[in-house]
Structures are given as C-alpha cells and as structure tokens.
Amino acid sequence: MSLKDKIRVIEDFPKKGISFKDITTLIADGEGLRDSVDQMAEFFKDKNIDVVVGPEARGFIFGVPVAYALGVGFIPVRKPGKLPGDTVRVEYDLEYGKDALEIHKDAIKPGMRVAIVDDLLATGGTIAAVAKLVEQAGGEVAGLAFTIELTELKGRDKLKGYEVTSLVDYDV
C-alpha cells in the first residue's frame, strides 16, 4: 500500500470546496509513519545537516523523528508569543492579512545547515517564511521536505533556489 493510500481525503472540510488531506490516518499507521520519516531522512542524509526545523504544529510531527533519524536536534518554529526567551521574528502575507513566525534567537548558529520539514506544501507562503527565518538567524537552508504537496497551488514557485522534495503529490 502506498503512502497516498494511507492519507484520508475529506471533501468540503474545513469548508465547502476544500479537499482536506488528513495525515492522521498516515501517522496512525506504523509502517506509513516509518516510511514517511525514512524517505525524508534519506533525502537529507548526504546534506551534512546540523539541525531540523519544523513549523507548528504538524511540522513537529515529522520534523522530530526525521531529526532523530539523522542524529541531530530539532528546533520548533512557532506563532508569536509561544516561545520563552528572546526570539527572531518574520512576518509574511496571507491571503487576507499578515501572520508571523518566531524561533529562539540562539537556536541556530551562523553557518548551520538546516533541514526544514513540514507536512504540507500548498502555496509556499508559510514555508518561505520559515526559510527566511532560518536565514535571518544565520542558518543555511540545506533542503525542504514535505509529506504532501498540492501541486496545482504552485508552492515550489515561492521556493526557487532551494532543493525541495515531497512524498505524495495531489493536483488539489
């Protein structure tokens, strides 16, 4: 059974016209979870990764085990006000407004090679902000890995200049 077969698709969620890709069925399946993590770790294995970064909340689900598989640490990227201590912040545009993400100021040392992991690549706005945050903190983005990519939304276009992989593609 493929990884795609282990992802539940729920139509009209969270609102009419949206085809929601539900990873809970994938991560509940031991083989599916292991295969996902193994494939992402394989993508990064020869990239001399120093640390894995993942945005909340579902980036944590895949980011932590990928970091474990690579033998490196994990750094969370959170919404403003969720991390204690000094942070570095980046703002980015949403369809209707702005949002922001933060990382601890001392989490990434200059020159660190960073793997970015998330569950889904859609429009690319959030993950482009994560990459900018990593670079603002002094890190070098060594690659980006996603469990799912919604190819019609052309998120890769916002990630030009980075090496990107996804495990499962959907038109939308």
Curated annotation (Swiss-Prot):
The keyword Glycosyltransferase applies. It is an enzyme of class 2 (transferase). Its EC number is 2.4.2.7. GO terms for biological process: adenine salvage; AMP salvage; purine ribonucleoside salvage. It catalyses: AMP + diphosphate = 5-phospho-alpha-D-ribose 1-diphosphate + adenine. InterPro entries: Ade_phspho_trans, Adenine_PRTase, PRibTrfase_dom, PRTase-like. Its main location: cytoplasm. Keywords: Cytoplasm, Glycosyltransferase, Purine salvage, Transferase. Pfam families: Pribosyltran. GO terms for cellular component: cytoplasm. Homodimer. Catalyzes a salvage reaction resulting in the formation of AMP, that is energically less costly than de novo synthesis. This is Adenine phosphoribosyltransferase. The lineage of its organism: Bacteria, Bacillati, Bacillota, Clostridia, Eubacteriales. The gene is apt.
